[in-house]
UniProtKB/Swiss-Prot annotation:
The keyword Cytoplasm applies. It is an enzyme of class 6 (ligase). Its EC number is 6.1.1.19. It is found in: Cytoplasm. PROSITE patterns: AA_TRNA_LIGASE_I. Monomer. The gene is argS. It comes from Clostridium botulinum (strain Kyoto / Type A2). GO terms for molecular function: arginine-tRNA ligase activity; ATP binding. This is Arginine--tRNA ligase. Gene3D superfamilies: Arginyl tRNA synthetase N-terminal domain, HUPs, Isoleucyl-tRNA Synthetase, Domain 1. It catalyses: tRNA(Arg) + L-arginine + ATP = L-arginyl-tRNA(Arg) + AMP + diphosphate. Belongs to the class-I aminoacyl-tRNA synthetase family.
Amino acid sequence: MDYKNLVAERIKENTELEVDLIEKLIEIPPKKEMGDYAFPCFQLAKTFRKAPNLIAEELKEKINKEGFEKVVTVGPYLNFFVDKTILIKDVLEKVLSEKEKYGSSKVGEGKNVVVEYSSPNIAKPFHIGHLFTTAIGNALYKILSFEGYNCIGINHLGDWGTQFGKLISAYRRWVDEEALEKDAIGELLRIYVKFHEEAEKDPELEKEARLNFKRLEEGSEEETELWNRFKDLSLKEFNKVYDMLGIKFDSLAGESFYSDKMDAVVQEIDDKGLLVDSNGAKVVMLDEYNMPPCMIKKSDGATIYATRDLAAAIYRKKTYDFHKCIYVVGTPQALHFKQVFTTLKLMGHDWADDCKHVGFGLVKLANKKLSTRNGDVVFLEDLLNQSVEETLKIINEKNPNLKNKEDVAKKLGIGAVVFTYLKNNRERDIVFDWKEILSFDGETGPYVEYSYARGKSILRKAGELTGEADYSKLSSKEEFELAKLLGGFNDAIMNAIDKLEPAMVTRYIIEVAKAFNKFYNAHGILNAEDNDVKLARVKLVEATCQVIKNALNLLGIDVVEEM
């Protein structure tokens, strides 16, 4: 039973408000002893022409209380206490019947959502900052898909621009082919850095690089062959990380894909009378929106990111007819996306309102114990490998005889890192601290994983239990609070979709793990006072494990069955 919906239906019977609006107004009381749901009666003051306190009292007398233990007033609020026995039975039966589908819905059926995320630059390090966009985008993709949306995951590769002219010059002069085969990104980065050092002494190198890129734009066979090699080598390295994270994309259409589509966009902007000359550059003026101009073409005629993003948005709308187009890109790019979306609106594309920028913070290291390949950039692959190694050390200390401990360390280590990136509001910076990330105490991935493994251990020991569970035996505060939390899984998911914030699911699952451990510590399960209580509690454990597994899967994290 959806109690929030039931509260809304009961209020609707006695007011003129619609259920959808009532559900949005319903709150969770700040203290558990105040009830399970609260409805603020302020919204009804105009209609009823009474003070909210009096309206609450009046509704309390009229409302159908079936399914609730009691309904009380707290000032202007109408507070509902659910019938604990009915709630526990409803929630556990629903979880155990729907299993891996529990928490899902068809709310997004028939709606396409484009999610652009990860988007590393070709020939540049796939560093620890990239995991923010990668983890958030992957989680949003999974969460939206779980609720019925048809998602298109796009890795908008940074595979075009004048930097490739520089890289071609650097490759021809200084590449070490042996080093390139061993560590492609490291070698490409080395020669790219060397190009900039040498260009300071010899400005002719910059001219040569521009000529190289011009040839690439014109389709020169030699330059195109080198560009493809850089791309193939980079993707081979990137795919190692994506394989570790279990991530696949529906499209790898990066910046180069739109190189032949930008002239049409520039022409469309010009045809609308929006293109203005500014010191030789072509811009769209956005003064009335309190924004600087959106540059479309530089003074040398080259297009820039904004032009490519405009072309990409128009192409995606034509190709996917999206309900939403989500850009998971760092918060510093907020102004850029405001300019792009506003320019789209000025071009007459009202669907620009369906384009959403999902920003995120920075990643900082608590100490310098993380090794780097070139002294300043921390490669993501190295970070994930180090997390697995550190986790294996912990397992060897705590449970050296654990079966498949390398596999467990891999799942736990990688999952711990992803969990850290998704734990807090995405716009907050992350301070990376191994001690905290890999701790089995506190609000961490390993803590949640350990809670799941503890539950699975109980289920293995319980074996096959026969008979129908009598959920009225679950009468304690800890049992009710846990079951009630399990019933709120879909609410957490819908909040994550509404705010485009995976942390809503992460925070939820931390609360579930805490509630489960409180229940575990307060009550005997396998040694319960009788078989009826034992069966009911085992079913509660089974439902908890199912919800934790479903939630972690939405975050892109594998569960560990034993540790």
